[in-house]
């Protein structure tokens, strides 16, 4: 077997292999002998068909199969010998072949990039320092009460966090635009569901009033024909409702899994959940900065085959979220996922090198701690822990999470870390908008 390797472009490689004629003929003869033992041909007993008859009947197809098998086996031998690490499915390109002669063919494929990490000590990370205060717990309790609130109709003027029922008709230059009209529209104010200025124009009016408000659509509004346009809305205010918050009674508190129904127990449970969320938010905030720094410091070529594979994964995930099937997943535009797919591939390659060069292995104690932390959010944590223990795939997934964390911490140990005190709400708002 003769082998030559050349670079086509970037990570592209072409291996050219020549298989000697005697190797081919020996393999063909061996396969024909095996075939002669199995084939049935009229006029001959099984296993007694003469070789020349078998060769005449099956020789061409056997030779084709032999060449295909030799192409694959010799390619594998070649990349092992040349220490080549291919990515994705190779493209086999057969050359001209005449019976009795050598056979030359090519295989084109991509290889993994050589990654040599650099600039780790120049990565800058701002680590949030946060604690859950009593005031934070008070705010969260108020949020829980608002989520469980009921609505009561009122005669007073609408306020910023009321719920209103309205009819409205929107127009631009006197012409009603598509989607600008609704009847009995229920609007919970204070949630920024409408364009800027709309809710402000409703505040101060009472049920039964008819009025108009002038607003401007944002420049980045999703509808192209409305971007930046001045509009007028004619509004009929039909109903104003105010929120009635539930008292922190024993019955109310027990809804949140606090067995004794005490306010102290509820505060403790809320604080525990907030601290768990906080821990995850800090971890993710730091991780994002580490990964951004790692990517910026290490520009690498990315195999197209890996990006294509990741795009397929993202397509399927997107389709599943919206109840789609495999066919619908493949119809989703590639451009929607290309940037995210490339980032994920780059991160995987860089962290893979961190893991390899530092000989990292998943810390089982960390794996167990991650499972326990995740399970603590469920009603029966022990049941979740036992479920993970019995499910090999889930357990391996958690090992990968732990190993990734260890790789991030390895990079973080070499980075420039500055601590910054922030409030709970500030951090969680940053996380929500990231």
Swiss-Prot record:
Family classification:
Belongs to the FKBP-type PPIase family. Tig subfamily.
Q: What is its main location?
A: cytoplasm
- GO cellular component terms listed in the entry, alphabetical order: cytoplasm
As one GO molecular function, the record gives: peptidyl-prolyl cis-trans isomerase activity
**What is the role of this chain?**
Involved in protein export. Acts as a chaperone by maintaining the newly synthesized protein in an open conformation. Functions as a peptidyl-prolyl cis-trans isomerase.
For this entry, the protein name equals Trigger factor
Its EC number is 5.2.1.8
Q: Which UniProt keywords apply?
A: Cell cycle, Cell division, Chaperone, Cytoplasm, Isomerase, Rotamase
Against NCBIfam families, the record matches this protein to: tig (TIGR00115)
The record's note on its domains? Consists of 3 domains; the N-terminus binds the ribosome, the middle domain has PPIase activity, while the C-terminus has intrinsic chaperone activity on its own.
Is Cell division found in the keyword set? yes
Q: Name one GO biological process term.
A: cell division
Which Pfam family, giving just one, matches this sequence?
A: Trigger_C
Query: Which reaction(s) does the protein catalyse, per the Swiss-Prot or TrEMBL entry?
Result: [protein]-peptidylproline (omega=180) = [protein]-peptidylproline (omega=0)
Start and end of every PPIase FKBP-type domain? Answer: 161-246
Task: Extract the InterPro entries matched here.
Answer: PPIase_dom_sf, PPIase_FKBP_dom, Trig_fac, Trigger_fac_C, Trigger_fac_C_sf, Trigger_fac_ribosome-bd_bac, Trigger_fac_ribosome-bd_sf, Trigger_fact/SurA_dom_sf
Q: Report whether Manganese shows up as a keyword of the record.
A: no
Location of the protein in the cell: Cytoplasm
EC main class here is: isomerase
């Amino acid at each position: 077997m003769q082998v030559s390797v050349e670079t086509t472009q970037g990570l592209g490689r072409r291996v050219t292999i020549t298989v000697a004629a005697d190797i081919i003929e020996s393999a063909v003869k061996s396969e024909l002998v095996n075939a002669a033992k199995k084939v049935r041909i009229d006029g001959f007993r099984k296993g007694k068909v003469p070789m020349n008859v078998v060769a005449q009947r099956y020789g061409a197809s056997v030779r084709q199969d032999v060449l295909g098998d030799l192409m694959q086996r010799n390619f594998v031998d070649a990349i092992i010998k040349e220490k080549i690490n291919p990515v994705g499915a190779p493209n086999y390109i057969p050359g001209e072949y005449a019976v009795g002669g050598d056979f030359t063919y090519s295989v084109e494929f991509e290889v993994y990039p050589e990654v040599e990490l650099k600039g780790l000590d120049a990565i800058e990370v701002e680590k949030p320092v946060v604690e859950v205060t009593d005031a934070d717990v008070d705010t969260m309790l108020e949020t829980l009460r608002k989520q469980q609130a009921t609505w009561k109709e009122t005669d007073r003027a609408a306020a910023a966090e009321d719920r209103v029922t309205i009819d409205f008709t929107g127009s631009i230059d006197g012409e009603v635009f598509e989607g600008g009209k609704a009847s009995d529209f229920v609007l919970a104010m204070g949630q920024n569901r409408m364009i800027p200025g709309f809710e402000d124009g409703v505040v101060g009016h009472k049920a039964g009033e008819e009025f108009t408000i002038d607003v401007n659509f944002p420049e980045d509004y999703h509808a192209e024909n409305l971007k930046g346009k001045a509009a007028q809305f004619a509004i009929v205010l039909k109903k104003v409702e105010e929120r009635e918050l539930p008292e922190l009674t024993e019955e109310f508190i027990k809804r949140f899994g606090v067995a004794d129904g005490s306010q102290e127990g509820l505060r403790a449970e809320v604080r525990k959940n907030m601290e768990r969320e906080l821990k995850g938010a800090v971890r993710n905030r730091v991780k994002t900065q580490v990964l951004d720094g790692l990517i910026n410091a290490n520009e690498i070529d990315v195999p197209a085959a890996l990006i294509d594979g990741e795009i397929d994964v993202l397509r399927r995930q997107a389709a599943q979220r919206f109840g789609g099937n495999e066919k619908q997943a493949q119809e989703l535009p590639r451009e929607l996922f290309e940037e995210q797919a490339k980032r994920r591939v780059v991160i995987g390659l860089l962290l893979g090198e961190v893991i390899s060069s530092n000989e990292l292995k998943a810390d089982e104690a960390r794996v167990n701690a991650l499972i326990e932390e995740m399970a603590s959010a469920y009603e029966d944590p022990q049941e979740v822990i036992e479920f993970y223990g019995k499910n090999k795939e889930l357990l391996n997934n958690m090992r990968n999470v732990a190993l990734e964390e260890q790789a991030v911490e390895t990079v973080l140990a070499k980075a420039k870390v500055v601590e910054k005190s922030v409030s709970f709400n500030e951090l969680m708002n940053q996380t929500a908008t990231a």
